Each structure stands twice: as C-alpha cells, then as structure tokens.
C-alpha cells in the first residue's frame, strides 16, 4: 500500500478483501474451494487489524457478502476503465490475469505482482497459460483449477487446453468441432 500511495500517478486506490464466508460459487458448485486449508491460526486475528489499518490510512476497504475479492476487483477495474481511468490491479492472483490488457474506451487494465515486484503483461500471461489474457477463462474451463477445487476435463491440463484454444479460437468453437479432434480419447472426452 505504501508503494502505491507513494506513486504520484495514483489518483484512486481501494483495498479489497475476501469475506470468510461462502460465495455464490458454492451454491453453483458446493465443492468449490472445499479442500483449501484454513488460514494459519496466527494470521486470522490479523485480518481485522489490517482492515482497521487500511481505514486509518483513509483508504476505502471493500468486501461484499457472497462475492470474492476477485469479483469486486474485476467489476471495479472494468467500471473504472469504462470511465476512462487507468487501472493497475495489484495482485499475484492468477485468476485476475484475464483482466490484463482489457480495455474499455481505450484505457487498458494493467496488473502488478507485488510478490515478485514486477508488472504482469500479456507476455507473462502467455507464458503462464499459453494464451492471451482474453482466453484465460477458456483454458481454465478446460484445465480446471486444483487450488479452487474446480474440476476440468479429465486428461486436459493447461498446456493441452492452451493448444486446443489456440487451434480452435475459443471454447465454444472447440466444443462445436470436438468431433474433428484427432486424438480419440480427447475427442470422446470433449
């Protein structure tokens, strides 16, 4: 937060938190994040202190019932971009990489990884997922996400998912042409 506040180019800043409750995703898929371990016991009492410190710094501290921080971040980022405001999402969360380069009214959304102290651009997204940011959701739909306990298509990981999406363009087209896939098992599975 200090780094963002010391950057003279920052006009707006919000700190967005997850609530420790289940989200609308759990209603759709009850096993969502079912195997994720609880936060370390010594960390839990610090959460309210971080929120309090954030507010003491005069920063908006946002969290919503039924939504993850990712959902709120994406909504605010797109709304700000539509309003012509340059956006930098500060996070190392791979799920937010789909926002990189998204543009509304010509204002692109950028991402910065504070853990690695480096920006995340389309090249970094391509390196991680094998596709551009706009296709990350398609790759995740095929490969699943073990961190969130979201199953993918059996036998298809990120590399194969990226290969398929790059070949067919998007998930919808891939599924429409699944019968054309050369590998029998993959064709059958899809």
Kindly give the residue locations of the regions a language model identified.
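Extended two-metal-dependent nuclease catalytic cores across DNA- and RNA-processing enzymes
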Residues: 34-190
């Amino acid at each position: 937060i200090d780094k963002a506040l010391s950057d003279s180019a920052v006009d707006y800043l919000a700190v967005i938190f997850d609530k420790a409750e289940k989200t609308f995703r759990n209603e759709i898929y009850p096993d969502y994040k079912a195997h994720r371990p609880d936060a370390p016991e010594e960390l839990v009492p610090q959460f309210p202190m971080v929120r309090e410190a954030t507010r003491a710094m005069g920063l908006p501290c946002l969290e919503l019932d039924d939504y993850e921080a990712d959902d709120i971040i994406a909504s605010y980022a797109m709304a700000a971009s539509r309003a012509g405001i340059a956006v930098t999402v500060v996070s190392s969360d791979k799920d937010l990489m789909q926002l990189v380069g998204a543009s509304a009214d010509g204002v692109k959304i950028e991402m910065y990884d504070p853990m690695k102290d480096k920006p995340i651009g389309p090249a970094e997204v391509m390196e991680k997922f094998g596709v551009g940011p706009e296709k990350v959701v398609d790759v995740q739909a095929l490969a699943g996400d073990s961190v969130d306990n979201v199953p993918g298509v059996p036998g298809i990981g990120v590399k194969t998912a990226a290969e398929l999406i790059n070949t067919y363009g998007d998930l919808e087209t891939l599924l429409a042409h699944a019968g054309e896939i050369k590998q029998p098992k993959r064709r059958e599975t899809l």
